[in-house]
Amino acid sequence: MKKKISALLLLFLFFSILPMKSFAANVPIKPWDYAQKLGKGLDVDWSKTKEGKEAYNSQTAKDFSDMGIKHVRIRIKDDMTDESFKLLDKQIKDCLDNNIIPIIAYQADELKNDPSDKNLKKVVKWWGKTAEHYKDYSYLLSFDLIIEVTDELKKEPERLNEIYEEIVTEVRKTNSKRILMISPRVRSNPEYLNDLKIPTNHNGYLMAEWHFYASSPSKTNNEKLWTTGTDKEKQIIIDKINLALDWQKKTGIPTWVGAWMAGDYNDGNNYSVQEQIVFAKFVSDELDKANIPFAVNSDTKFYDRQNNRWYDEMIPVLKAMGFTKNNVDSVIDKKTEWVKDNIGWWLKRADNSYPKLQWELVDGNWYWFDNNGYMATGWKYINNKWYYLNNDGSMKTGWLKDTDGKWYYLNTDGSMAVNTNVGGYNLGSNGAWIV
């Protein structure tokens, strides 16, 4: 009897000292709980591109965790070989070790170009092999079945539903309670969520992935227009989110934004950091209000993977999205010192550098520094737009009555509004209110 009690006591002690998260990770996670855990993350090419595969190292996951990245969407386009699994295993382990949720997302290009039975079998086989390999992994790992339904497949909603039915059936053979994600056609557009048919074997562990502005906002394309953040431009974003909320209410299935981008990095890079911040803050705030998690596209725009460091100039954009770097903040945000000499004010950073010919965010306000590094005041013409800096150097927004007695309007990004109507007041080509 004493031996039995001793054995039970040892067993109790053994389990009591194990980390709680090791148990939690091996318990199936319901979709709504999973959505809350996802929080805010990044799309990554760690297992997709040659450069991404070669550059990846464990420090990356540590840095992501320190920045407050809660999940990563690991995009994959190739067949899974032993080497592919070896690298992906490492990435997933690194994520879990650093409290980052990993999501495997498959490109399935051939199937999107030609949704034939032959190509469907290839994708079903790919997911079957991948699901078998990860069947005993933490339930924090999830599967995003197809990245962006584009090309020919986007024209065939019924075929897409058949495809999801077959893939889900295959994955459920080995992963009955793992979170799976399906996305609507036409580049995961939430307008087509209602076209989705819920797969038979969803088993109550299903989410929908959708996105907008995945490749960028635009200053000319009306479908994803963002210039200065007009009411009309904001409404485009709100309407998309409401489509997702309506679908969630109708189906009881949570959604997640798998990709959105703060700037047009791949198409001219026409948005300044300051403009990106204004856009990023509005999008992230609206998604936060809706309790919809999101992933930002993509890591290489913010993180130097060759040198394992965040780009200092992009940290304000990350912060606008709600990411917070732990322990050591950017020199932009901490350990800065205002210095005044016989010419004017300038900003000394922790590394003794100082901003020149650029905007800098300090204590929640934007400042412009000239080519000598001195803080600007008054009207300044920057990148083909007029801005007004208050006497303390902070950027002005809203209505401004200038010394000439005329009224001007400064947009949310600080730029002067021209040739437009604001609140019923017409503004001319020089920005002044036309009386």
Q: Where are the regions that the model predicts?
A:
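Acidic/histidine-rich helix-loop elements
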Residues: 40-58, 76, 80, 115-118, ...
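Aromatic-rich peripheral "rim/lid" segments of glycoside hydrolase catalytic domains that contact
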Residues: 268-335
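Aromatic-lined substrate-binding rim segments of carbohydrate-active enzymes
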Residues: 57-111, 120-125, 129, 133, ...
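Active-site region of glycoside hydrolase catalytic domains
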Residues: 124, 128-225, 231, 239-263, ...
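Extracellular adhesion/carbohydrate-binding repeat motifs centered on closely spaced tryptophans
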Residues: 14, 24, 332-435
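Sec-dependent N-terminal signal peptides of Gram-positive bacterial secreted proteins and lipoproteins
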Residues: 2-24
